[in-house]
Structure formats: structure tokens, C-alpha cells
Amino acid sequence: MNIEIEKRLIENKPGSFIFEFANSLAEKDCMDMIDRFEKSESEHYQGRVGQNFQKNTDIKKSTDMVISGKDDFKDIDELLFTSLSKALSAVKKQYDFFTGPFKDIGYAIQRTEPGEYFHWHIDSGSHQFSDRQLVAIWYLNNVEGPGGETEFINQDVKIKPEMGKLILFPPFWTHEHRGVTLKKGVKYIATTWVVFK
């Protein structure tokens, strides 16, 4: 594997199992994703939560769109897959028992505007959520804030969005996290979950 890829994957804080992969996406690709998301307004929906995919603005307020399975986003789907595969290879190299086999469950893009948020939550659970092994979030733009960070309560970690950065972390009860309420600017992310095949 490319040594440069391994060097770019760092653990945010020792023992946190929150990994950052800077420049996982090129600036031009991030800008293209944002532009194409904004031009697909008819496919946007209010952010959903839980296994029943319900709207609950007490927990999450954002504008989301699934891009996987759409012909006009196939190139973006492949770009995210390639980025994720490189990062997973680096994680596997560091942790012998993180062997898979794994796959993603498809990709979505999310926009958060001032006053919006994703309050404290975890990304695992029973039934169809039980296969989830990692959360993947790509930041598609720089967010000066205040607000917009990804914050982890048990690890005392707060990550500021930086264009092109990918973060990976476990979805379990150990990693309760939130998207801090954005007070200024607009935040764009792409997301997926890594699951067992």
C-alpha cells in the first residue's frame, strides 16, 4: 500500500479510535459534489433518523439526498468508494483483527444551514443497524463557524470541518457524537456506513 496514504491517516487522540484522513477528496471534487447537490433540489428531503427513517427535527435538522443508485451521480459514488477503500486499507494495516469483509451501504450528501444540527446520537443498534462497523464522514467544505463541528462526548474530541477530510469512527455506544448546531455559514458532508458483507 502507498506509504503516503498511511501517513495521512491519523488517530485524532490516542485511544479514541477516531481517525482522520486529510485531503481524502480533491477540492475540485468537493466543489463539484456541492454544485450537483444544489442542482438536484427536487431530490432533497428533510434529514431522517432511526431504523424507520423518520423525520424528527428534535434530533436532526438538515437537508439530505441519497446519491447512490442515481445514474447522474455514479462518478461521485465511485469517487467516494475509492476514497473510503484507501482509508480502510490503512486502518486494516494498523489493526490485524479489522479484516472484514466489508462494504459500504451507499452514499448521501447533507447540507446544514445556520440553526441546524444533529444532536447527540449513535449510529448503531439492533436489526439492520447491527452490521455497522464504522461511520464515514467527508467534509466537503471548510466551516469557520461558530458551530458545525463533529463532537464526541466520551472522547472529548471536537473536529472542525475541513474540505476534503474523511473521518472514520465506530458507530457504537462508546462513540456518542453530534453535529454541533451551526451558527454561521453552510456545512456540506457526504456520509456512509461500513458494514459486513
Which residues does each predicted region cover?
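Catalytic core of non-heme Fe(II) oxygenases with the double-stranded beta-helix
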Residues: D71, E78-K197
